[in-house]
Amino acid sequence: MKFAKVLIIPALPLILCCSALAGESVKPETLPEGQHMYVIERVIPGAGKLTSAELKGIAQTSCGVLKEMGPKIQWLQSYVTGDKIFCVYLAPNEEMIREHAKKGGFPANAVSEVSTIISPKTAE
């Protein structure tokens, strides 16, 4: 499995900040012109059982690819579930998202553009 190779390669130097916006609340309608928000569904059997060290290695690989690709693509955060990882990225287009996945050896089973975000505050 190609993805397994990512877990056993030597770790890249830790990049402390993959995205200038990481940890901040970002809404698609407030993005600069030409930037779009995407949710990437990555089917990874056993994802929820990955160790902290394995997740760190995956994050380091992703950040290394992002650094190589430049500031037009940014990783905001990811959600790890039983057999999937859902990642939120900013990029000018879906092709750049898929290029990142290919370069990092990550699956990108579905890439969906986010049109808006709702939360409990939406009900107020």
What are these regions (language model features)?
Residues 18-68, 74, 119-124:
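Short S/T/G/P-rich N-terminal loop/turn motif that feeds into the first structured element of a domain
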Residues 8-19:
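Bacterial N-terminal signal peptides
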Residues 1-5:
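Positively charged n-region of N-terminal signal peptides that target proteins for export
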Residues 45, 80, 113-116:
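Residues that form or immediately flank small-molecule/cofactor binding pockets and catalytic motifs
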Residues 38-43, 75-101:
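Short, well-ordered beta-strand segments in beta-rich or mixed alpha/beta enzyme
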Residues 16, 69, 105-107:
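Short, structurally constrained coil/turn elements
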Residues 90-119:
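An amphipathic, aromatic/His-enriched active-site/gating alpha helix that lines ligand/cofactor pockets
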Residues 71-77, 110:
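A short linear hydrophobic-aromatic micro-motif
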